[in-house]
Amino acid sequence: MFFLGQKKKTEEKKANHLEPAMLDQIRSHFEKIRHPVELIASLGEKPKAEEIHDFLEEIAGLSDKISITSKPDAERRAPSFSVARKGEDARMHFAGLPVGHELTSLILAILHAGGHPPKAEQALIDRIRDLKGDFHFETYITLSCHNCPDVVQALNLMAAVNPRIQHTMIDGKLFLDEIE
């Protein structure tokens, strides 16, 4: 099992997932974070676990308001991680590596968890907040899907606004056994 903070047996150079210009752009967006945000990792033993660990460290390194904790959870898919305002229950979950088209979904989830207001009409936000009942949505995505980010971002927005809504983005390629 791979844990956050664990050193690799070989001191190979970590591959950066993002280009320096992209990192600078994300860093500037993260300046809008008002409240501390946690990335809560449940990495398990699958091959992508170490890559997700490195990616989370890369993202957390862009703001002193973002921290990473390791919390193995038998109820969660592994490898996965959640985004939450520090001290609150996580409602936005990522089972896979949100890169490519899905990177924006992660950035927005972090911003919303950190208190940056969503860009949506107040009437829509009020309707989402007023939804009764508990909801847990799961979205299977592929990183080549051009429509998937819109769905993921809409459901993450709902989860950010209403504490009774949860959403999990699932990389279908990483969890093939669930979609076959």
State what each model feature region is:
Residues 21, 98-101, 150, 174:
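Charged, alpha-helix-enriched surfaces in structured cytosolic catalytic cores
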Residues 2, 83-118:
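Non-catalytic, surface beta->alpha helical segment in thiol-disulfide oxidoreductase systems
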Residues 11-12:
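Acidic, proline-/serine-/threonine-rich low-complexity intrinsically disordered repeat tracts
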Residues 57-86, 164-180:
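Thioredoxin-like thiol-disulfide oxidoreductase module
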Residues 116-131:
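Long, charged amphipathic helices and adjacent flexible linkers at domain junctions
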Residues 1-8:
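N-terminal acidic, proline/glycine-rich, low-complexity intrinsically disordered segments
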Residues 16-58, 129-167:
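Local sequence-structure signature of Cys/Sec-based thiol-disulfide redox active-site neighborhoods
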